[in-house]
Amino acid sequence: MDTQAVRAYLLDLQDRITTAVGTLDGGTFVTDTWDKPPTERLRGSGRTCILENGAVLERGGVGFSHVMGDTLPPSATANRPELAGRGFEAMGVSLVFHPRNPYAPTVHMNVRCFVAQRPDAEPVWWFGGGMDLTPYYGFAEDAAHFHRTCKQALEPFGEELYPRFKQWCDDYFYLKHRKEARGVGGIFFDDFAELGFERSFEMMRAVGDALLPAWLPIAEQRHATPYGERERAFQAYRRGRYVEFNLVFDRGTLFGLQSGGRTESILMSMPPVANWRYDWQPEPGSPEAALYTDFLPARDWV
């Protein structure tokens, strides 16, 4: 179990993504390297890369963190009560890109490795991650391309993984109180160890490496589409759903806040502008209504 190899991959992934997306945007990611003091309950370090007010990205962040703690927080043991009381080591890369143009979709990706340990027992390790697409104005070809890229990334590890991880994503990124999906989904997995450490690590790398080919061509095609105030207003309204999900349901956000993580880095996923309107409904037959009828309901895209 070579966690240093995982760390090296994650740092390289962060570099590759910020370089490629910075080239698309024309802006520069600001790098914030941080360390948690050894006196805090969560120890470790990380590197947060942020681009704000760019030509393409209104806000985008790519964060790497490598942290350790003496006790797993409740969000990490909710599905694994046998791990309560163990110390842990967690490392990962998490990103969210919020484009300025409402016709360009938001994307989220995360890959992570987790080790729970106790002196009198073998360490328990697993990988998690995935990526999902959140359009404001949907294009079937974009959703199909995104899902096709996810499917191709997973195929070498078993044809059953894509449909399984897609369903997991559809179930996970669902706002129960709104009875609607956050976007058009993608793939999601957690507590994954079934292929053994090396092969599971390889699968996680395939997911991380798929982010750029999955999202970059869509952003390149959509970021210059003409738009007006109506589209920006709808984008801000739908971004409100993103905020609701991240603060109410997202396991990564809850884990970070419950374990004493770095708040600025945890909340870098938040959109720069969002709003709420009381009981707003889209006009029937409008492009805004099409998001609800044609894109948010779960469906097979490939």
From Swiss-Prot:
Q: Out of the domains of life, which is the source? A: Bacteria
Localization per record: Cytoplasm
Q: What segment(s) does the record annotate as region Important for dimerization? A: 242-277
Task: Detail which positions bind a divalent metal cation.
Answer: 98, 108, 147, 177
State the active site: 108 (proton donor)
Which residues make up the annotated site Important for dimerization?
177
Entry keywords, A to Z: Cytoplasm, Heme biosynthesis, Metal-binding, Oxidoreductase, Porphyrin biosynthesis
Q: A Gene Ontology CC term for this entry?
A: cytoplasm
Q: Whom does it interact with, and what assembly results?
A: Homodimer.
What is the protein name stated in its UniProt record? Answer: Oxygen-dependent coproporphyrinogen-III oxidase
To which species is this protein native? Ralstonia nicotianae (strain ATCC BAA-1114 / GMI1000) (Ralstonia solanacearum)
